[in-house]
Amino acid sequence: MKHPFSRLFSFGEKEQEEAGGKQEREEVRNIPVASIIPNRFQPRTVFDEEKIAELALTIRTHGIIQPIVVRECDNGQFEIIAGERRWRAVQKLGWTEIPAIIKNLNDKETASVALIENLQREELTPIEEAMAYARLIELHDLTQEALAQRLGKGQSTIANKLRLLKLPQEVQEALLQRAITERHARALIALKDKEKQLKLLQEIIDKQLNVKQTEDRVLKMLEAGERKPKPKRKAFSRDMRIAVNTIRQSLSMVENSGVSVHSEEEEFDDYYQITIRIAKK
């Protein structure tokens, strides 16, 4: 029997056999709270303690309506697959046991379930959501378009989230802590220069700039950069042209012999760089 997420992220026959070879009865068992460990693939890195406390009060009044889902580890512990907030809440209540369903999932499936479950709840920060998308793409070797189709989202939504991961770590941390909004962060992407991005990040936080003010500041910084005269690069000397052309001709000869060669050329102020990669097979 396929697990629910396999309809979204199809696994090979071997993986299906490993995951479903043992017929699992979804039997609810009470397992010790102390023997449970968090999901190492959990995309959520920040838990709102106030909301956990509210959940604890609800559980105290109504009990656990939906059991958590875990998998058994080799050392006798249980790793959470879904329900970490409930587990944290009962810890606050001092419970010694919690109702759980034990699943037989491998690492890839466990990671997928954790990522998808959290994405469906729509409580992740933008940066956590971006990291979840990136992890799913890596796990299942998907394109952005394929991931978007499986999750029922627009490809531009996935692309915009993933661009956030190109921002400096300090900006990502500000997003994670909700010190800035996603629209603030997306405005910073246009600057490209890390130093400028961090400078404006600090200004956003210190002056509590709204999105419109941030976008205006970005525009001014870009315009100021365009006005600065670019230093003239040194012209190619005759010897330099001969050297570069000789290398290009040599690479063509190697490629014609059937060897796979990839080269990249880049011009700098003081030198011209040619990077060559030759496949081993």
Swiss-Prot record:
Gene3D superfamilies registered for this protein in UniProt: 1.10.10.2830, 3.90.1530.30
GO BP term, example: chromosome segregation
Chief place of localization: cytoplasm
InterPro entries, per database record: Chromosome_partition/occlusion (IPR050336), HTH_ParB/Spo0J (IPR041468), Nucleoid_occlusion_protein (IPR023705), ParB/RepB/Spo0J (IPR004437), ParB/Sulfiredoxin_dom (IPR003115), ParB/Sulfiredoxin_sf (IPR036086)
SMART domains listed in its UniProt record: ParB
One GO CC term, this protein: cytoplasm
Entry keyword Cytoplasm: yes
Superkingdom in the source lineage: Bacteria
Record feature DNA-binding region, as residue ranges: 145-164
Start and end residues of each stretch annotated as Disordered: 1-26
Any one Pfam family match given in the protein's UniProt record, by short name: ParBc
Subcellular localization, as worded in the UniProt entry: Cytoplasm, Nucleoid
Swiss-Prot/TrEMBL keywords: Cell cycle, Cell division, Cytoplasm, DNA-binding, Septation
GO molecular function: DNA binding
Role according to the record: Effects nucleoid occlusion by binding relatively nonspecifically to DNA and preventing the assembly of the division machinery in the vicinity of the nucleoid, especially under conditions that disturb the cell cycle. It helps to coordinate cell division and chromosome segregation by preventing the formation of the Z ring through the nucleoid, which would cause chromosome breakage.
Record-linked PANTHER family: CHROMOSOME-PARTITIONING PROTEIN PARB-RELATED, NUCLEOID OCCLUSION PROTEIN
Family: Belongs to the ParB family.
Protein known as: Nucleoid occlusion protein
Organism: Geobacillus thermodenitrificans (strain NG80-2)
